[in-house]
Amino acid sequence: IKILAFLKKSCQNYLHLSESESYLDEEIHTNKITVISATSNKGYAGGNNIGIKYALQSNDCKYIWVLNNDTEVESNSLSLLVSEMERDKEIGILGSKLVYYHNKNVIQGLGGKYLPWRFLTQHIASNHLITSKYDNDTISKQIDYIIGAALFVKAEVFKTVGLLDEQYFLYFEELDICLRARKHNYKLKTITDSIVYHKEGATISKEKNAFSEYHYLRSNKLFIRKFYPQTLFLYNMMLIAKIANRVRRGQFDLAKANLKVLLGIKYVNSKT
């Protein structure tokens, strides 16, 4: 409902894609709403690709805004992104200033870096006060990727480098698409005046569990194999150390999840 109100206020022409029909019944007949029902949980990449493929069928589609289901935006957030994309034709993917929804004085991130020899992702300006001032160009030189909760992508990018990689079920999809875009000489940039509030928890439970740990580690391994294969041996050694540490702490579910990543065994969860 909130995203519909935003679209009506901010855009003359829009296409809203959703997996749920329940709250859209009265809007569908306006001819501005298209509802797509997924047959199964395909994860972040697979689910978003359904909508992206549909949008790309239209010759009028210039940009695609991928937003998590646990985000809310300011009324001018989209227009700022469109203006910057129109101004600089070399930009392929834009990000917004992500702010914690439940603590709107604190920044979640302005983009991210990947530390390949430590196998870690790191959000830039994480936990800084929202009143902190940042230069868009300076921040953009520091980032390796746009945070996946809010990706504003030129349609041309998907046509050139391909869709989100569905090998990843959760995590690292945005790193993958951003690295592929950069290899094709598209620029990444964060527009810090464009604000997106992220509840960070509606998509994935905040509680650390075997399911989320498995997918984070598995996706990290897939990403390493694809872009940093020289570090794969060290990553596997790190997994062995993590397994031993989980066992030592009595965290046997997490140890089992780590072991499955190491051995390449699929994690089966009744909720997916």
Regions found by a protein language model. Name each.
Residues I1-S40, I50, Y54-S58:
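Acidic donor-binding segment of Leloir-type glycosyltransferases
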Residues D60-E72:
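Short beta-strand-to-loop acidic/aromatic patch adjacent to the donor-nucleotide binding site
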Residues K42, D70-E72, Y168:
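Acidic metal-phosphate-binding loop of nucleotide-sugar-dependent transferases
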Residues A210-K221, R225-T272:
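Non-catalytic, C-terminal membrane-associated alpha-helical segments of glycosyltransferases
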Residues V66, I93-K97, I191, K199:
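Short glycine/serine/threonine-enriched helix-capping/active-site loop
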Residues A38, L67-N69, D165:
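Active-site acidic Asp-centered loop
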Residues D144-I195:
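A short, conserved alpha-helix in the catalytic core of glycosyltransferases
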Residues A5-F6, S10, H16, H29, ...:
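Acidic/His-rich active-site region of diverse nucleotide-sugar glycosyltransferases
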